[in-house]
A protein has these predicted regions:
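Conserved histidine-centered catalytic loops in small-molecule metabolism enzymes
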Residues: 433-498
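Short beta-strand scaffold segments in enzyme catalytic cores
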Residues: 100-106, 245-246, 459
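Zn2+-dependent cytidine deaminase-like catalytic core
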Residues: 106-222, 308, 341-347, 403-405
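Flexible, gly/pro- and Lys/Arg-enriched active-site loops
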Residues: 406-445
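Active-site ligand-binding patch in enzyme domains
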Residues: 138-150, 232-236, 240-249, 253-390, ...
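Residue-level signal for inorganic ion chemistry
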Residues: 83, 101, 167, 207, ...
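Short, basic/aromatic recognition patches
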Residues: 75-95, 233
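Short gly/pro/ser/thr-enriched loop/turn and capping motifs at secondary-structure boundaries
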Residues: 195-198, 221, 290, 317-319, ...
Length: 498
């Protein structure tokens, strides 16, 4: 199986135009370290210093990796924040491509903006240039030949603010660098640097060679956070893992008798479906399947993308009539059952069951066992990565969460806490397993952030070296609030696009 992609409706809330490069949407400046979004890196120290200056409205100057000085002021930060807000709109739709936003500005006024809306469709830069033409009445679309100007001459001398360095290679469509050059863009302001080794900075080089001024690392930390999934996947070739659970105020995920519906309220449960929409795959253990018979689908008020469903089932106990298996013949998202059972042994009953499951559209994935005879988390992640799965939401149960934490595979954790006390020594907690033998061996999750969802609290934890996917709603809303506040003060020349 060459790759797995999330099935998506033809249209959600977003409109789209054009085609996208099937591999990376943008490739960037050379990264010397594996994870470009590590908060402790030197590059992010520059970015955070710059962000602090932006907040004070002061110019910031620092060297980028090409050795050139980078200067930007409060206006640059403001327009980049708008590009970030636009980029978040593609969350859940662009995988395995990155999230990218672009704003075109001339003389302090926004003349075009766009974002990478869906995998297989136009990139942010071409959408923004096409928007320039639409706003000026110059044509109905930016779907032009590779060397044509999507902006129809409307972007001459303008500045393009892009959250990720523009791509410079040819895939399903020409490079975005060519579109920016053809449009007569005079300056490109870049937020993040792409760790994709295919181009290693050639995008900025191509723009500079064409006489375009390029300033990098504007709001670098915030732009890096946009693409923590993409950066992790492009450098590690394994999914970015988010562990999630819901619990009572005393740390219980169910009553002693097993009743767990519902710990949290409707607002928290709706937020879980946002996570399912944004991440490429969802994982549970066979115990959850046997107890709850779930579908593991994304159910939002508006159409969402559906995650690939993964069940850890070391002994292939999954019922052939369960909701997950039945849904495979109804056009639902792909279902992968990861097992250590001897499915390759033709004489084994497991082999016959695996064939029956396969005939119904289930992929039975044979995975090496760990020391305890369970599905090896590290082997599973490598196999999912080879199938193009760039992110994984681990929803439990407690044994599965323990396996991922014990394997050191969790990039981020999300806990929904309800104002209830369940009590009872036998009531389960979120993470099972042997546990830490002493406090020094406990898994450190780093500083927490929180959101209030109805009566519940959402806690988001990112271990050192990881950015936060689950907090993206908060970031996007803050970016929009900043923009509207600036507009109220007369600083923003136009309102954000709807």
């Amino acid at each position: 199986m060459a790759g797995i992609t999330k099935p998506q409706p033809q249209k959600g809330n977003e409109s789209a135009a054009g085609e996208a490069v099937a591999a990376s949407a943008c490739d960037g400046l050379t990264q010397q370290t594996g994870n470009a979004c590590a908060p402790g890196s030197t590059q992010n120290a520059h970015a955070n210093a710059a962000d602090a200056d932006d907040a004070r409205g002061k110019p910031s100057t620092f060297a980028n990796s090409a050795g050139a000085g980078c200067e930007h002021d409060a206006d640059d930060a403001r327009f980049m924040r708008r590009a970030i807000e636009l980029a978040w709109r593609g969350a859940g739709w662009t995988s395995p491509n990155p999230l990218v936003g672009c704003v075109i500005v001339r003389e302090g006024r926004v003349i075009g903006e766009g974002w990478h809306e869906r995998y297989g469709q136009a990139h942010a830069e071409r959408n923004a240039l096409a928007d320039c033409a639409l706003r000026s009445g110059q044509g109905a679309s930016g779907q032009l030949a590779s060397h044509d100007d999507p902006a129809h001459g409307c972007a001459q001398g303008a500045t393009a603010y892009v959250t990720l360095e523009p791509c410079c290679h040819t895939g399903k469509q020409p490079p975005c660098t060519e579109a920016l050059i053809a449009a007569g863009i005079a300056r490109v302001v870049v937020g993040s640097r792409d760790p994709n080794p295919l181009v290693a900075g050639k995008g900025c080089e191509a723009l500079r060679a064409a006489g375009i001024r390029v300033d990098a690392d504007v709001l670098r930390a915030a732009c890096d956070e946009l693409n923590s999934v993409f950066f992790h996947f492009i450098t590690h070739k394994t999914p970015y893992v988010v562990a999630k659970w819901a619990m009572s105020a005393d740390g219980k995920i169910a009553c002693a008798a097993g009743d767990a519906r519902w710990i949290t309220g409707p607002e928290a449960r709706a937020d879980v479906h946002e996570l399912r929409h944004r991440l490429a795959a969802i994982c549970v253990g066979i115990g959850t399947v046997l107890a709850d018979d779930p579908l593991l689908t994304c159910r939002r008020d508006t159409p969402g993308s559906q995650p690939v469903r993964v069940v850890l089932d070391s002994r292939l106990r999954i019922p052939e009539d369960c909701a997950l298996v039945r849904s495979c013949s109804e056009g639902a998202a792909p279902l992968i059952v990861a097992t250590c059972a001897p499915v390759a042994d033709e004489a084994s009953p497991d082999a016959a069951k695996a064939k029956r499951l396969a005939s119904r559209g289930v992929e039975v994935l044979s995975v090496a066992p760990d020391a305890a005879g369970r599905v090896s988390v590290s082997h599973l992640l490598a196999m999912l990565g080879s199938r193009g799965v760039d992110s994984l939401l681990v929803e439990g149960g407690a044994g599965v969460l323990a396996a991922f934490f014990e394997a050191g595979a969790v990039n981020e954790a999300v806990a929904y806490v309800a104002p209830k006390v369940i009590g009872g020594a036998e009531a389960p907690s979120p993470v099972a397993g042997k546990g830490a033998p002493c406090m020094a061996d406990a898994v450190a999750l780093g500083r927490a952030t929180s959101d209030v969802l109805g009566d519940d609290v959402k806690l988001m934890f990112a271990p050192a070296g990881s950015a936060r996917v689950a907090s993206q709603t908060r970031i996007a809303l803050k970016a929009a609030d900043d923009w509207h506040a600036s507009a109220a003060e007369g600083g923003a020349p136009c309102s954000p696009a709807s």
